[in-house]
């Protein structure tokens, strides 16, 4: 039995939307801020606490413009009916934005700057494209390879460096879809997905509760027919072994252990350690390796202590390279057991909290105690969180 100290940071609950296709998907008529507000309301409804206790709403979002602009974190709180006394901020660490939101809230709790936080993230890549309004400095090419801005080519680089074959990537991608669909049909996502109204292909209103990007009918034969998506001459990375562009949001209720006890709320897990790390931008997908190593050191653990792992699948070549570097190639039965971003999609600002929520549910379903959530970040970073069930 884990004994909690008053300032331990605990996860009380976590939710997410289903993941929608970016192109003509089920959330094509739903705004990013509206989708996020639904999740915040769900956290309040699912947990018996006074929202006046919320110190801050911290939201991850990458492209902060259009409907995602003007501090979407604050707008979400107002839309959700959270008392105006709570603050709201928006964080950007690219793909790691909502995990950084978790880390920021945790650090504030640890240092006595609040006890109750709602964190999360969103990206509506159908409404706000990944490169919308982006103007990169031409001088950046003096400091890192120009192709470092092209995520698919960084995956190709990692694949070549680690001798990851096309066949291995196709098998990895196919398994992601298989696991995700099995988790869907067996109800393993039911506790984390909050139904949000969207539209079907014909435009009819529907409650969206199933991830739209999963391909339950995917076969190896289909995947092998696809051409390389980023390097047409010698490439091995295809659309089927890349995380899908998608629309989605995630949210978590975080507080100090002392506050949870006062409110009579049962924590589901505590945060054992957190870390970020940088690496060469040309191999940005390697970032989870140094970030995980830092987090393990801070927790006084080794990779062998991790019982369940969520590794964001930016690309199969990237995921397999990270597994190889962390000596997890032969332990893929504990990694992304409910599928990953290749099958579920990767709405940039959403994914960090999403994989942490999925990790927590997977740990409860598998009855494991220690888990790791980690992900790569564009331009050469990684982020990692180790949690322990309580």
Swiss-Prot record:
It is an enzyme of class 2 (transferase). This is 3-ketoacyl-CoA thiolase. It comes from the Bacteria. Keywords: Acyltransferase, Cytoplasm, Fatty acid metabolism, Lipid degradation, Lipid metabolism, Transferase. Pathway: Lipid metabolism; fatty acid beta-oxidation. The active site is at residues 95, 346, 376. InterPro entries: FadA, Thiolase, Thiolase-like, Thiolase-like_sf_Thiolase, Thiolase_acyl_enz_int_AS, Thiolase_AS, Thiolase_C, Thiolase_CS. It holds the Pfam family Thiolase_N. It catalyses: an acyl-CoA + acetyl-CoA = a 3-oxoacyl-CoA + CoA. Belongs to the thiolase-like superfamily. Thiolase family. It is found in: Cytoplasm. Heterotetramer of two alpha chains (FadB) and two beta chains (FadA). CDD domains: thiolase (cd00751).
